[in-house]
């Protein structure tokens, strides 16, 4: 079933406009959220909030080289680097932090020459979903690094340290370096700052969890149903991202919408 679901989903993703829309909407969100914080700080005359809003942009620019390196790695290996568990394509099975490719020799029970041939065919057929994942990696890396820098600055200021002092610079460097494990994944184990940072990156790429959400949590319920009944996946190939897009719209609507 997942073999045919993968063919169907990749056919939907094969259009260049679909890929462009994914990147464009993610870039808009990455740029708008700091503006919201800066604007809110300006209205309240809160210089700290304004400073942290600009720090988000600073962090994204500072980490651009590393973001591109991680994005290339994701494209090369065909899997997410920073956050393998939450992604736009929500029908994939995750085992050991890696996505199981539906069209692969291992998944279909073939090895040797036959398995290699199926892997090659799968790489071609699943190229659209790989490109989608690569775009998500770029956006999520940018948001994560920007927010990590923002949270590092906030933590340093809360400790009463000057950002230009030796102690302040060491604290900034420590927090930023602790943001990733040895494989480049977000290091969220026993680290509240990094967990908060990853949540921000997920929200900015519309890949945050649907559980406990608005509209009586229907998005999460539909997602669970399709995970347990993949034969119906063709009815709604994507659940997480469209639901989060709608929730983001509801959160920004000037009048509270029913169910939010």
Language-model-detected regions and their locations in the chain:
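Amphipathic interfacial helices
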Residues: 1-260
């Amino acid at each position: 079933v997942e073999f045919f679901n993968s063919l169907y989903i990749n056919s939907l993703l094969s259009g260049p406009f679909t890929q462009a829309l994914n990147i464009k909407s993610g870039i808009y969100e990455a740029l708008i959220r700091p503006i919201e914080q800066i604007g809110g700080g300006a209205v309240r005359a809160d210089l700290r909030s304004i400073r942290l809003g600009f720090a988000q942009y600073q962090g994204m620019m500072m980490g651009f080289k590393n973001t591109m390196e991680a994005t290339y790695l994701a494209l090369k290996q065909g899997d997410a680097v920073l956050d393998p568990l939450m992604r736009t394509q929500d029908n994939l099975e995750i085992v050991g932090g890696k996505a199981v490719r539906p069209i692969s020799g291992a998944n279909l029970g073939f090895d040797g020459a036959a398995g290699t041939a199926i892997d090659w065919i799968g790489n071609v057929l699943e190229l659209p979903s790989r490109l989608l994942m690569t775009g998500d990696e770029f956006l999520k890396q940018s948001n994560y690094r920007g927010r990590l820098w923002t949270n590092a600055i906030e933590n340093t200021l809360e400790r009463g340290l000057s950002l230009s002092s030796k102690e302040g610079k060491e604290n900034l460097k420590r927090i930023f370096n602790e943001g990733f494990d040895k494989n480049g994944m977000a290091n969220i184990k026993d680290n509240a700052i990094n967990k908060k940072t990853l949540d921000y990156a997920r929200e900015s790429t519309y890949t945050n969890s649907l559980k406990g959400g608005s509209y009586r949590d229907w998005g999460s319920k539909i997602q669970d149903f399709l995970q347990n009944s993949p034969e119906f996946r063709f009815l709604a190939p994507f659940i997480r991202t469209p639901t989060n897009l709608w929730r983001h719209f509801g959160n920004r609507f000037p009048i509270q919408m029913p169910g939010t």
